[in-house]
Amino acid sequence: MRYVASYLLAALGGNSSPSAKDIKKILDSVGIEADDDRLNKVISELHGKNIEDVIAQGIGKLASVPAGGAVAVSAAPGSAAPAAGSAPAAAEEKKEEKKEESEESDDDMGFGLFD
């Protein structure tokens, strides 16, 4: 990620085609040593591509990754209709408890790092 960030920083700073030397200079400025193999891989993958298009594609891919922020929020207790009763509220609490347990097992966001 540090190589991609450095590449983007150089590209957004006006360097349309950052070299390994440019990226190493950025990384050295914050005390990070560069791995030449990874650095060359990032440069070869991003060389000649429009950075804005790459960012847009990345945002599209991230949109499909579950973030856990879409949890349903129940209405305030006083605003519920009187006919609703307490049975649906109890069912919601049970669902929320089950959901919390399953979220712990999904810490890898749907994909494993070492698969």
From Swiss-Prot:
Q: From start to end residue, where is composition biased (Basic and acidic residues)?
A: 91-101
Give the record's keywords alphabetically.
Answer: Acetylation, Phosphoprotein, Ribonucleoprotein, Ribosomal protein
At what positions is N6-succinyllysine found? K21
Q: Looking at the keywords, is Ribosomal protein present?
A: yes
Which InterPro entries does the annotation name?
P1/P2_N_sf, Ribosomal_P1/P2, Ribosomal_P2
Q: In the record, which positions carry N6-acetyllysine? A: K21
The question of whether rRNA-binding is a record keyword is answered with no
Query: What spans are recorded as compositionally biased (Low complexity)?
Result: 76-90
Example of a GO cellular component annotation carried by this entry: cytosolic large ribosomal subunit
Listed under subunit, the entry gives: Heterodimer with RPLP1 at the lateral ribosomal stalk of the large ribosomal subunit.
Protein name as it appears in the record: Large ribosomal subunit protein P2
